[in-house]
From Swiss-Prot:
Pfam families: PdxA. It comes from Roseobacter denitrificans (strain ATCC 33942 / OCh 114) (Erythrobacter sp. (strain OCh 114)). One of its GO terms (biological process) is pyridoxal phosphate biosynthetic process. One of its GO terms (molecular function) is zinc ion binding. This is 4-hydroxythreonine-4-phosphate dehydrogenase. Keywords: Cobalt, Cytoplasm, Magnesium, Metal-binding, NAD, NADP, Oxidoreductase, Pyridoxine biosynthesis, Zinc. Its main location: cytoplasm.
Amino acid sequence: MSPATAPVLISCGEPAGIGPEIAVAAWDALQGTIPLAWVGDPRHLPASTTFTAITHPRAVADVPTGSLPVLVHDFAAPSTPGHPDPANAQGVIDVIAACVAWVQEGAAAALCTAPIHKKALIDGADFKHPGHTEYLQALAGGRSRAVMMLASDALRVVPTTIHIALEDVPRVLTPALLRETITITHAALQRQFGIQAPRIVVAGLNPHAGEGGAMGLEEQDWIADVISALAASGMNLRGPLPADTMFHARAREGYDAAIAMYHDQALIPIKTLDFDRGVNVTLGLPFIRTSPDHGTAFDIAGKGIANPTSMIEAIKLAAHMAARHV
């Protein structure tokens, strides 16, 4: 199927979270504009949902208007909002794998993943991966490293290290890792965002980007060298820059994406600037994957108050990237 007709798949995520309800709300907002299919157990959808069960993504085109196409994957148990059931953990994992298989074979244009709850997956299925992104990388065969971008109209930002303790960042952060992160980001901005000459800024690790060695040595010992070498190859790069002055409005006008050194250095600014509209994008995979930039929100699941905006933006961005993907 071509990207124009192939659907974006929405994986169910943790069925006891807000994933099912925001997926339905997003489909309702976008139906008629982007072909979509939800993948999971229909018992986990809001009770009022009108849906049509299908067995292959190509059948989305045959589903009547006003009915959610559902690629049915039977789970072990029903779900109770706010209370994850360990019996359903393997089902969550298997749905992600099924979606990846369909996207990789070209039956679907892209994957938009609803939030998972890692502890529930560990408790119920001995999940071995630090997070969603790392599992997707494994499903892709580990051919390249998956890089997490957080994107909105206000900012695109990429953390070089992701789901590790802050005390481990200096050890895990290496010249090779930073070089690969910048290179993958640069390629994705060209291929999937249509930016032919991306402008990228790189944060320092330490306060004030080390302040000449007074507050840390990584910037002068090797971060600056990595940036200089890649700039010499033709990339438009600046850095290392103090992270505390990289994200104000005027600074953001000067770049297309920012590279951060660790998780919170990247996620705090985007969630402050555009909390409801942020999208998690996985770069470096052989397929397109986006996700809303929030978690399962067990405390409000099933109450009808979850905001679907980030899911809507994630689906729209997935479709946009699929149309540009080369």
